[in-house]
Regions:
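Non-catalytic alpha/beta scaffold blocks inside enzyme catalytic domains
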Residues: 1-176
Length: 180
């Protein structure tokens, strides 16, 4: 797709309080999965706020936001960059997007997540998506195809198979073989 930077944002660094038994300091679901995929904040990649500042300065032509609310920066960013927003909820950042793609919430799509201990668990769709909302993976496929690229997979099972083939932490796993 010609993407030069992928950033999951500074939220991955946001930590809360923890105990020695059950409560983890990391309050982000699936941050371990992001780390396994190499998407954790790292040297040479703009952090969340730095990406926003670069967009406000006109240094980014396109900004793809998945679920991130730009808040007070939304209008300034939208004035300088094409903002493609993939969001499940209405907020200032979503409404300021040049192109807004309605994303289903987690309960409206199949998939998996990796907990802080590395256990990969399956998530099953519990509800049908509202209105024209689509699962995030479907929106990503449509976006890739609209840019002239063939989507590498068409279902959560196929996506997970690709993940298992390319990421050592998921080798030998299959979506159907995961526990809930």
């Amino acid at each position: 797709l010609g993407v030069t930077q992928v950033e999951v944002g500074d939220d991955l660094k946001a930590m809360g309080t923890a105990d020695d038994y059950l409560i983890q300091a990391d309050k982000n679901p699936n941050s371990r999965g992001a780390v396994d995929l190499g998407l954790a904040p790292r040297a040479g990649v703009l952090g969340g706020q730095a990406v926003i500042e670069a967009a406000k300065a006109g240094k980014l032509a396109v900004l793809l936001l998945v679920g991130h609310d730009l808040g007070a920066d939304a209008v300034a960013v939208a004035a300088k960059a094409t903002v493609i927003g993939i969001h499940s909820h209405a907020h200032v950042g979503a409404l300021a997007s040049t192109l807004l793609l309605p994303k289903a919430v987690h309960a409206e799509q199949d998939g998996s997540f990796t907990n802080v201990k590395g256990r990969v668990q399956r998530v099953r769709k519990a509800l049908e998506p509202l209105a024209e909302s689509l699962p995030g993976y479907t929106l990503a496929f449509h976006l890739a195809e609209s840019l002239g690229h063939k989507a590498p997979a068409s279902s959560p099972t196929e996506i997970f198979s690709l993940l298992a083939a390319k990421v050592p932490a998921y080798e030998g796993l299959s979506l159907d073989g995961l526990g809930n």
